[in-house]
Amino acid sequence: MSDLGESPSSSPPAPPADTAPPPETPSENSALPPVDSSPPSPPADSSSTPPLSEPSTPPPDSQLPPLPSILPPLTDSPPPPSDSSPPVDSTPSPPPPTSNESPSPPEDSETPPAPPNESNDNNPPPSQDLQSPPPSSPSPNVGPTNPESPPLQSPPAPPASDPTNSPPASPLDPTNPPPIQPSGPATSPPANPNAPPSPFPTVPPKTPSSGPVVSPSLTSPSKGTPTPNQGNGDGGGGGGGYQGKTMVGMAVAGFAIMALIGVVFLVRRKKKRNIDSYNHSQYLPHPNFSVKSDGFLYGQDPGKGYSSGPNGSMYNNSQQQQSSMGNSYGTAGGGYPHHQMQSSGTPDSAILGSGQTHFSYEELAEITQGFARKNILGEGGFGCVYKGTLQDGKVVAVKQLKAGSGQGDREFKAEVEIISRVHHRHLVSLVGYCISDQHRLLIYEYVSNQTLEHHLHGKGLPVLEWSKRVRIAIGSAKGLAYLHEDCHPKIIHRDIKSANILLDDEYEAQVADFGLARLNDTTQTHVSTRVMGTFGYLAPEYASSGKLTDRSDVFSFGVVLLELVTGRKPVDQTQPLGEESLVEWARPLLLKAIETGDLSELIDTRLEKRYVEHEVFRMIETAAACVRHSGPKRPRMVQVVRALDCDGDSGDISNGIKIGQSTTYDSGQYNEDIMKFRKMAFGGDNSVESGLYSGNYSAKSSSDFSGNESETRPFNNRRF
């Protein structure tokens, strides 16, 4: 202990020894490790070392206060005194290299260790040394021993006891932060003693640059890190582990976000698909029902009798003396659906034509003179047709649906939607419409020359010339072809007959009665809840099953062609038994005329040979193809138009099938089907509206078609 006291006192005279200690330190450092392990050896060396460190320290006494001030916080971990020695080892080497690298910093680094030594010298009692070691994390006993052991390890060890440990450790931290930050407290005494000379001399040059940084290195000892090697490994591993965890967390978060986005996308796509499928499915027709069935098919009023169309182109017995013009106007309609017209007010005039399209109920009452009975053109099961004159002088036909008729409302909606899309010179034109409370009215162009039925079968009228018959046939065929081919979706008329073919003054045909027309969506067939049509014009498959195609219209048009050729009615009660049906009577004669060219048995005798034979023959051939029992084997209306409206070869209207060689036609079965249809539709012997042949050929003026029995009697007789 006396030696320890002397060492501080002797330290002042040893300034010249500053040059010597650096070389001595490496040699002594090699022996240091064993000395560090054994505390007794340091005291012996301490006598020589203090003078070495002291000469350099005395000048920077002023720096002493700040260093001890920094040390107290570091006293948290005094237990590792032996650890402090390695930092001390690092301090001895710094002086020489620092002096070489940067004069000022090395001096600073050298000076700080000296003040503690001076403090130790000024305070011979080891208590101050004990205080200084705790910050440096050496044990209090090592304080005095450090002056001895550092000389063995390195002369400046005592000055670096605590303050020196902090400056060198701190410089080491900035230079090599990862290794030294945890190892700053010098938990590496064993490792450092093993190889202090070479690493530490190299480290000191780095220390001067970062010499001022003391707290970081000191903070590490406070953490009580183990050996410096372990500290270095922990520091690097800690940083790497933190970064690794961060990367893993980011990867997991990114994967979770991507998975969430994918799930959301799939869910939305599935919902959209379900919505799309629902939207499409709600417009698909029921296998036994049609999309627009409510708008086109309506129940009949037994009291009113059977009507060929929802608008009543056929009239009841009380109105049979009315002109057949009312029949044609009774069912033609147009415009927009009811809900669209209410929301938009009036439809586009481009669709309905120029001029006024929407009329008030008061306006229509005025133009029809208060819907006077004298202006009635006809009356059907669902309303009356009135003749009226607009303010501009244009004559129109106004159809008024019966108030409170739900069927009439549906009919109105169907008609206005269909006719609003149809514009053709051979189709009846829509002028406007009216919606007022419960009133639903449609305004059509007035066709002045009545109907084909009127001109063919009216008594007291001149015989319809053959040229006019050909013109009517071609015009009506073009109108139907437009409905079937040029309307999208196609429109099936469903009630083609001579009473629904209007004639203008030039005998140009205009097809009317779209009340029974139905939009044929994408399917080729529709099954109706009720079969509507006129006996004598119904296709066999339609009458029996309600199956509807455009070929059903072709069959009905074939019956009209037979009317034009023969001048006979579709059903004639005055004819011999088995010949009441025009189609049944004409089938064998058609085959014979085509095979032999003999037209005498088919042609209307009233024409008195005033016809063109090849035109008659062409019309006969076309009619025979149209009335085939097999629907698919009938021609399309486009083919019919080409066959009728060409002067040369009309092509193969028969589709390669000779007349009479199609599916065998059982007229008895057809009659049975018609009877079943009558019972299904009307439930008994309710009279059918006989306005079918209105005008001069009403039930009251002719025994022909006086009622339901007149049309069905041939079928009843046929069954027996």
Curated annotation (Swiss-Prot):
Signal peptide: none annotated. The gene is PERK12. Residues 1-240, 300-349, 698-720 are annotated as: Disordered. Mostly expressed in apical parts, including flower buds, and particularly in anthers. Also present in root hairs. Pfam families: PK_Tyr_Ser-Thr. It is found in: Cell membrane. ATP binds at residues 377-385, 399. This is Proline-rich receptor-like protein kinase PERK12. It is an enzyme of class 2 (transferase).
